[in-house]
Amino acid sequence: MGRPVGQTNQAQPSVQHTASPSNKVSHNGGIGKPANIPTGIPVNYQQTQNQWSSQLFDCMNDSENAVITLIAPCVTFGQIAEIVDEGATPCATAGLLYGALFFTGASFVYSYMFRARIRKKFGLPDAPAPDWITHLVCMPFALCQEYRELKHHGFDPILGWAGNVQQAQQQEMMTPPTGQRMMG
């Protein structure tokens, strides 16, 4: 039997669709994107548990961030929240909310949830204590550790989400293609 015109003998890539509990239904009636679709910056989601790239009290590994966090923890938290939320929560909004909660003594209730999301995203252990305890007792150290962890995974929290996406796209454009040959 012959092949229709235009068809080649090359194997076609197979696409496997799996149902995922992370698919979200948006309130506007459409289906939201699954959480496992890339959103600009590739991140390795691993099921095995990794270790934090630095210890909780290693704040002087990034002394500039340690000083900023000591003086204005709301700035560091805002930067972390914007990256973890993939730009959905701007740094200023998260920082102001954190600052307001800080003066009530309840900022740990808001901030520990972002630590949990970082742990989940990078497969990190709930150590040295549960997230809420770490943020309640060691808040500035926890924020510094989370900031360093994001940097370890290639994010620059100072740039914000959009800046990190733009930087990743520029690096991708600068990377030469591999495995291509000239056909003659």
Swiss-Prot record:
The chain crosses the membrane at residues 94-114. It is found in: Membrane. Residues 1-33 are annotated as: Disordered. One of its GO terms (cellular component) is membrane. Its main location: membrane. Keywords: Membrane, Transmembrane, Transmembrane helix. It is a single-pass membrane protein. The keyword Disulfide bond does not apply. Residues 1-26 have a biased composition (Polar residues). Belongs to the cornifelin family. May be involved in heavy metals transport. This is Protein PLANT CADMIUM RESISTANCE 5. The gene is PCR5.
